[in-house]
Amino acid sequence: YDEALEVLSNPDIADETVSAKINEITSIKASLVNYEGDIKHIFFHSLIVFPEMIFKDKTTPMGGYNAGFSEKAEFEKMLPQLYERGYVLYDLNECYEKVNGIMTRKEILLPPGKQPLILSVDDVAYAYGNGYAQKLMVNDDGILVNLVKNPSGEIVEMIDGDVFGVLDLFVQEHPDFSYKGHKGTLALTGYQGAFGFSLDTEEGQAEIIKTADALRAQGWNFASHSYTHNSKNFFGANSNPANIQYDTNKWIEKVAPYIGQTRLFIAPFGYRVKQPGLQYILDAGFEIYCTVSHEIINELYDDYALMSRIEIGGYSMTYYTKLLNENFFNVDEVFDADSRPPVI
């Protein structure tokens, strides 16, 4: 609102219409209230576009994609319900700031009845692409699209081939679902490239930069999801400070040059790195640390903020229906059990 008022205050454009708009915006701004409740954060993996390509056997219980992924059709059913419940897509960066070196929660000023929703998407490497997108790129017409193999084996361009395009189309119809045009956060790894492109070739790097710029223009920002995404020796029981330092430096060296610096760290597997390894992450400039939980957690420490994320996929829609029903959407109206095998 402040930015709009600043633009409209230019005497060169002053007239009755502009004056009325200034009064309207001033009135709206005065009505905003500080949201003081829990900040909720949901996350997705790539959307399953063609479930029939992944779930060929619907009788044998299955984890993997079935557990951790949502289908495109399911995501499209979630959005109207999130909107109707008063959620507003909010920038994770706008939730916290350091004041005199101490991490604090910022005021979150929203219209009455609205609450912030943080949305993030993990990985986006598109390493396999069977039933979901293979690439995210800017096409020859300058449009951000996914390349998706359809059941006929054809590679087709889809504007709505993943979270980004589906969400963008929804926000175009419901602009008040987004605060200041923000959409969400992409949590990028590096070991498999980014957006379906290699980080090790000039051609791949150029495509990654173009895609990142297009995403940023659509209201997305970026987080480190670690470079290795490795639970064995890095983000798991065998984690050690030397490996955390290696992984952190590797992400900054290999990924950050093409998508930009960030202060957001979204831990792989939701693993909470302990000291002294955590210090390498904090010293690298990451100030907001996100885990995974089926509880809503917002915690402040002197030098960082901790926030839990709730995964939205087959597992949570099967085993955590109460949590999702109470907070986000009606699972029975969203979950497509007919297209999936039983979830384990």
Q: Model regions: which residues?
A:
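A short acidic, helix-capping loop that chelates divalent metal ions and anchors anionic groups
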Residues: 195-196, 231-235
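C-terminal active-site subregion of NodB/CE4 polysaccharide deacetylases
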Residues: 31-92, 104-119, 128-131, 217, ...
